[in-house]
Regions:
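Bacterial Sec-dependent N-terminal signal peptides
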Residues: 1-39, 550-551
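N-terminal amphipathic/hydrophobic interface segments
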Residues: 31-551
Length: 551
C-alpha cells in the first residue's frame, strides 16, 4: 500500500510538471505570435473598383492569364482614392493594379501623384510608382524616379535619388521618406538643402515641413552668405535663418571663427555660445575664450562672461587678459566712421612677458586707439612700476605712442640691488613713444623725485638726489637711458650714501606691489587686491563710463 501511495505521488508530480510545461509553451507561442503594439492592422476585403475603360479584354493564354487588360481612359477607385492611366492590368484576385502611361493617383484634395508606371496593391494599400514620379502634397512637391507610398502609414519612400521642394527650400538626397500626415521627412546620403542663398550639406537630415526646421546629424555644413557653419548635431530654421548647434560646432566668417559646445547662431541677429567658447580673429591676431558669449551682428553689441580671457598675439610677445565680464559696443555701425568700445570689469589682470597690469576696470576705444584703466590701476614693465587713479595708453597699430597717468601718479624703478628705488610722484604724468621706445617723460604738478646716482665705472650707488618742482621733463636715449632733464623752479638736495636721512629713502606715498603682480599667463585668474592701507587715497574717482546693454 505504501508503494502504491509513492507511485501515485510520483504520477501526480509527473502530471503536474507536464501541465506546467504545456502552459509555459502555450504562453511562449502566444507571446511570439503577439502583434507589435505600433503595427497597424492591414484592412482585408476592401475591393479596388474599376470605374471606366474604353477597352477591356481577358486572355487566359497570355503571359497574364489572371489579369483584365484595360486600355483608354482607365480609372479605378479604392477607399477614397482614385487612379487613372492610359492602360492597366487589373488583378481582381489579388486586388491589385499595374498601371501604365500618364498614371495619376489622387487621395483627397491634398495629395496627388503622377508617374509613367505604377503598381497598386489594394490589399496592402501600397502604391509603387516608377519613372518621372512627382508627388504633390499641399505646398510640397517631391520629384524622384522610384517611390513607394504606403497609404496605411501615410509615408512615401524614395530610394533612387529625390528632390523635395517646399517654397524657397529645396532638398536633394539619395534616399528619403516623407510622412504626409505629420509633414515630416528624413533624408539620407549626399543630402543638400537650399534655402534661398543658403546651402546645407549633410549625411542625414530630418526636416519638419510645418516648422521649416532641418535637423542635421553627422558631419554637416551650412553656407550662409560669407559664413560657414560646421556641426555634427544641429537644427536650422530656414524661415528665421537661425541655427542651434551642439557637439563642438564652429562658425567661420571670413577671418573670424567661433567655436563652442553649444551655439545659437542667428544670421544678422544675436548669436549665443555656451561651454568652452573660443572666438578667433586671424586678421587682427586676437582671440577670446569664455563659457558664455553673446553677440548681436545688427547692433554690434557683445557680452562675455564665465571665465573670459582675451588674447592678443599680434606682437612678438602674446598678451593675456582676464576679468569677470567683458562687453563690446559698436557705434555708427554700417558706416565708414564705425568704431568700437571694449569694457572689461571687474578684477582685470593682464600678462605679457614684458608687461603686466591689474585694475578694477578697463575700456578700449578703437576710435582713438585708447586703452583706459580705472580704479587702482598698476602697470609693471621689467623692474618698473606705474600707478595712479587713471592710466590711459594710446596705441599706434599695436605699439604704444602716448601714455597718460591722471591723479596721484607714482613711477618706481627698482635698482639692481632690489633694495633701493628711483621714484617720481606728481599730479599727472605723460610719456611719449617712438616705435615703442620712450622718448620723453613729463611729470606735472607737485613733483617729487628720489633718484639714486651711480658710478659710471662699476654702477655702484654714490648718492641720493631729492628734488621738488612743479614740472619735470626727461629726455630719453637708446635703451631708455636718460640724456637730459628740464625743469623750472626747483629745490634739490644731494646726499652721499652714508648721510641719507631714513625719511628720504622713500617718498611718503611709496608702495611696491610686486605681490599682486601677475607672474605668468596662468596667474591672471587669481585675483589679489592691494593690501589694506596701501590703496590710493579716497578722493573723487575716475569711474569707467560703462554703457548700458539690454540683457
Amino acid at each position: 500500500m505504501i508503494n502504491n501511495i509513492i507511485f501515485d505521488n510520483k504520477n501526480r508530480h509527473r502530471i503536474f510538471s507536464i501541465l506546467i510545461l504545456c502552459l509555459f509553451g502555450f504562453c511562449l507561442v502566444q507571446a511570439m505570435q503577439a502583434p507589435k503594439k505600433n503595427a497597424k492592422k492591414r484592412p482585408q476585403g476592401e475591393r479596388v473598383y474599376l470605374l471606366h475603360a474604353d477597352e477591356l479584354r481577358y486572355d487566359m493564354f497570355s503571359s497574364t492569364p489572371d489579369a483584365q487588360i484595360l486600355k483608354g481612359k482607365v480609372s479605378f477607385r479604392h477607399q477614397g482614392s482614385n487612379l487613372t492611366c492610359d492602360s492597366a492590368y487589373f488583378y481582381q484576385g489579388s486586388n491589385s493594379v499595374k498601371a501604365f502611361g500618364h498614371v495619376h493617383y489622387r487621395q483627397g484634395d491634398t495629395l496627388s501623384l503622377i508617374c509613367d508606371r505604377a503598381e497598386y496593391d489594394g490589399q496592402m494599400q501600397m502604391m509603387r510608382a516608377r519613372k518621372n514620379v512627382v508627388l504633390h502634397h499641399r505646398r510640397q512637391t517631391l520629384n524622384t524616379d522610384s517611390l513607394d507610398f504606403d497609404r496605411l502609414y501615410n509615408v512615401a519612400n524614395f530610394f533612387d535619388g529625390g528632390t523635395l521642394i517646399d517654397g524657397k527650400d529645396k532638398l536633394v538626397a539619395d534616399w528619403g521618406e516623407y510622412h504626409t500626415e505629420t509633414r515630416e521627412a528624413k533624408f539620407v546620403y549626399n543630402v543638400k538643402l537650399r534655402s534661398g542663398k543658403d546651402v546645407v550639406t549633410t549625411d542625414t537630415l530630418y526636416y519638419d515641413v510645418l516648422k521649416s526646421m532641418a535637423h542635421m546629424v553627422g558631419p554637416s555644413k551650412i553656407i550662409s552668405g560669407g559664413s560657414v557653419v560646421k556641426t555634427e548635431d544641429g537644427y536650422y530654421d530656414t524661415k528665421a535663418d537661425k541655427a542651434q548647434l551642439y557637439g563642438r560646432s564652429t562658425v567661420v566668417d571670413k577671418d573670424k571663427t567661433l567655436t563652442g559646445d553649444t551655439l545659437y547662431y542667428v544670421k544678422d541677429g544675436e548669436s549665443t555660445g555656451y561651454g568652452n567658447v573660443v572666438y578667433v580673429d586671424k586678421k587682427n591676431k586676437n582671440s577670446l575664450t569664455c563659457n558664455y558669449l553673446r553677440y548681436n551682428e545688427k547692433t554690434g553689441k557683445g557680452f562675455a562672461t564665465r571665465n573670459p580671457v582675451a588674447v592678443d598675439y599680434s606682437q612678438k610677445d602674446t598678451l593675456w587678459m582676464h576679468s569677470d565680464t567683458m562687453r563690446i559696443y559698436t557705434f555708427n555701425i554700417n558706416t565708414d566712421s564705425v568704431y568700437r568700445k571694449v569694457h572689461a570689469y571687474p578684477k582685470v589682470r593682464a600678462y605679457r612677458q614684458d608687461l603686466q597690469a591689474v585694475c578694477d576696470s578697463l575700456v578700449f576705444n578703437s576710435q582713438d586707439s585708447c586703452m583706459t584703466m580705472y580704479k587702482d590701476p598698476v602697470v609693471w614693465n621689467m623692474n618698473r612700476q606705474l600707478l595712479g587713479e587713471k592710466i590711459m595708453v594710446y596705441m599706434n597699430d599695436s605699439t604704444v605712442r602716448f601714455a597718460h597717468v591722471v591723479g596721484q601718479a607714482l613711477s618706481i624703478e627698482q635698482m639692481p640691488d632690489s633694495v633701493h628705488y628711483n621714484q617720481i610722484t606728481s599730479n599727472e604724468m605723460k610719456s611719449y613713444f617712438d616705435h615703442g621706445e620712450i622718448k620723453t617723460a613729463e611729470s606735472i604738478g607737485n613733483v617729487q623725485t628720489v633718484y639714486f646716482m651711480t658710478d659710471d665705472k662699476d654702477s655702484s650707488l654714490i648718492g641720493l638726489n631729492y628734488l621738488e618742482t612743479d614740472t619735470l621733463r626727461m629726455y630719453m636715449g637708446p635703451g631708455r637711458k636718460m640724456e637730459k632733464i628740464w625743469t623750472n623752479k626747483f629745490t634739490s638736495t644731494m646726499y652721499p650714501m652714508t648721510q641719507i636721512p631714513p625719511s628720504k629713502y622713500k617718498l611718503s606715498n611709496f608702495a611696491w606691489f610686486d605681490d599682486i603682480r601677475p607672474k605668468d599667463k596662468n596667474d591672471i585668474f587669481v585675483w589679489r587686491g592691494k593690501a589694506k592701507g596701501t590703496e590710493i587715497k579716497n578722493i573723487k574717482r575716475h569711474e569707467a563710463p560703462l554703457q548700458k546693454i539690454t540683457n
